[in-house]
Amino acid sequence: MADLKEIYNEELISQLIHHVRSSYPDFNKNRFLDTLRLEDWPELTLKERMRRVTVSLYETLPKQYVEALTILRDTAPHFKGLSGILFPDYVEQYGLAHWEESIKALESFTQYSTSEFAVRPFLLLDQEKMIAQLLAWSEHKNEHVRRLASEGSRPRLPWGKSIPALKSDPSPVLPILEKLMQDESLYVRKSVANNLNDISKTHPHLLRKVADQWYGTHPHTDWIIKHAYRTLLKKGDKQALALFGYENADSIQLHDLTCQPKRIVIGESLEFSFYIHSDRDQKVRIEYAIDFVKARGQRHQKVFKITETNIRKNETKSYTRIQSFKDLTTRKHYKGIHTLSVIINGEVKDSLDFQVC
């Protein structure tokens, strides 16, 4: 899989120059390229490349913000997805003093890419005013704008600027999410679930309040609530498990937990297997956890879901899973004793140690 930063390549730069010149014939290509400084391009991250383009546009477009914004609004429809986040980034960097024009531009840009990161400084500047705007966007006809209402207000948006006030008190976000609880777009519903999951990490009582009000009212809301509870479910929260019908696992026996190999080299995979038996009909959520050794020798547990299923009285089910120990950009592996645990309905049923070397 190609590195995401390669989206910002020479072809994109050429296309950007072409489309900007179509709207602004006086655009100085040479000055733009000089300020872009492509000689160190390979070393730059995705965000650094995007920001370099944003700054170079600022140095080359008209200094009047509204005039430059008009050119960018003409250009933006030609750039979809991550390639288009440079346009909201321009607003984020240079548009805070031009609230009305910037908000209209972000509404437009998000329909081709996403303005979720660019709205964060506006929340920091005037949270009450921006929350009101996000609430208005929650009723927009375009699903990308409705998603922006939720995604932009997430207390813990990945890659996004932190909003300390919403981390401390996320309740202002709830009216926005309530507008979207039955949204017809899965794209929007995923964002709502992610927002509520963010909230649950520090304010689980607020998620419970939403669940009490909405769970069981519509298939869309049930889907949102279930996905919003994923962190609490992984933590084995008893109230969360009970909400979805997972009772205690006293009647479940787990047998023959084994893993191969017992000594695993970084880059290889661990295979483990076990079987379960139930003394009664029951709904089960089966997970496994690995206590990974970290860089300084401390351990950090990560929980992975295996399945959610029903098991009948006197039924036996077997499971085999493979866990890769190949280094990823999101996880680096270290040598040492690791622990594998199997969890059923929030209860650890068995564990074993293995060596990573």
From Swiss-Prot:
Q: Where does each HEAT repeat begin and end?
A: 173-211
The record's InterPro entries line, in alphabetical order, gives: ARM-type_fold (IPR016024), DNA_alkylation (IPR014825), HEAT_type_2 (IPR021133)
Induction data: By mitomycin C and UV irradiation which requires RecA.
Coiled-coil residue windows? none
Cystine residue pairs: none
Which Pfam families has this protein been placed in?
A: DNA_alkylation
Which PROSITE patterns did the record assign? Answer: HEAT_REPEAT
The entry's protein name is Uncharacterized protein YhaZ
Organism of this sequence: Bacillus subtilis (strain 168)
Per the record, the gene is yhaZ
